[in-house]
Amino acid sequence: MPAMTPAFRRADLTGFLRTYGAALILLLAAMLAWQPAQAQLRVDISGTGATQYPVAIADFAVDDTHGRALAEVIRADLTRTGQFRLINAAGSGLNVDSQVAHDDWRAKGADFLAYGSITRGPDGRYDVRYRLADTVKKGQLDGVAFSGTEQELRRVAHQIADRIYEKITGVRGVFSTRIAYVLKRGSTYELQVADADGQNPQVALRSREPIISPSWSPDGSRLAYVSFESGKPVVYVHTLATSARIPVANFKGNNSAPAWSPDGSQLAVALTRDGLSQIYIVSAGGGSNMRRITRSPGIDTEPNFTPDGRSIIFTSDRSGGPQIYQTGLDGGDARRLTFNGGYNISPRISPDGSTLLYVARRDGAFRIASLNLSSGSETLLTDGRDDQSPSFAPNGMQVLYAAIQNGRSVLAGVSSDGRVRQTLSVLNGEIREPTWGPFTR
């Protein structure tokens, strides 16, 4: 067997030996009902996209307080992408029925203008109507109405931002999607789910012992993860709406690194039940049925299905150092994908299957890299010293990862071309192992 370097040992089994290897003792986990989490967030953004679309977002009329808040969420969503340049729309006086003075807005530098109205109905629900104007072509690009409670208005704002993003760029927006991550506060670990902007965090699971490797089901209704509560790592599938969960990999040895098949029926996992860590497939519904995929003389871990469900990307040290490979579900010969550098781990593949994302060690630093699978061209997306756990947004345009800032682990994001970066700091804890959820509607 090839020698396993300390660095690869750190990364093996999705990082739990790196961080928690000394913590394999009798554990006690407290599973909680779906509940709000209290977190103070700070978002910092730097860089701009190669193309910036000039857009004005007017405050929504009639209900000034809610209309202003609605517009602020939309502006913040678009700003975080780095693809939009906001044009001042203060004092526009527009409502959803206004006639747009296209030439005037064009003179202000806005190629696009979003505006609308929000009113409270007799049933207490809010009616939101929005329009998107193209000031260059002097026409309406989009117009739609929403209805929701006061608590749902932020979600409505994200939906409007999604529509604006798609109408202007041609790419589906991700502002209405969710993210999951592990938050560590003191000696407590929380598996949290939040909106894509980090707001509205909810606790899915709280434990005094480590929770690692969260992975979204394709429909966004469940999370698979590894919990140590039984005295060893066990893979669970957790239904978010009910907090019900089942163990799906609880074999002898370590059970780790769950990844969903595209149809949501199976999970690829890394198991040591037969010796070294190898890749297996188990049912997402539980049970003892499983199928071994890899049989190598090295350590195989961190599996991920390709979008077509026909093969698996994984990390292995079979060539001497950790590199990324691809194999069919029949377990045939694996094909090596990464050749730059001696250390590449934590693979993720883009939703369209064209790009590989991974952690690359370069000049002693762990950085997020992307590989064009057609050309073989590698791009280093980040410049941190210890960047970990990359995850694609469901539209493939952004990448979520964990970074170290001022000695603390924070949530970070970068555009898929590396030009725009953002960090989201939780002021009373450390964020680990983020993963971006799928489109759900």
Curated annotation (Swiss-Prot):
* Leader sequence residues: 1-39
**Keywords in alphabetical order:** Cell cycle, Cell division, Periplasm, Signal
Give the superkingdom in one word. Bacteria
Q: Where in the cell is it found?
A: Periplasm
Cellular component annotations (GO), alphabetically ordered: periplasmic space
**What biological-process GO terms show up in the record?**
cell division; protein import
Q: What does it do?
A: Part of the Tol-Pal system, which plays a role in outer membrane invagination during cell division and is important for maintaining outer membrane integrity.
What does the sequence similarity comment in the record state about its family?
Answer: Belongs to the TolB family.
Subunit-level organization: The Tol-Pal system is composed of five core proteins: the inner membrane proteins TolA, TolQ and TolR, the periplasmic protein TolB and the outer membrane protein Pal. They form a network linking the inner and outer membranes and the peptidoglycan layer.
What is the protein name for this chain? Tol-Pal system protein TolB
Q: Which organism is it from?
A: Bordetella bronchiseptica (strain ATCC BAA-588 / NCTC 13252 / RB50) (Alcaligenes bronchisepticus)
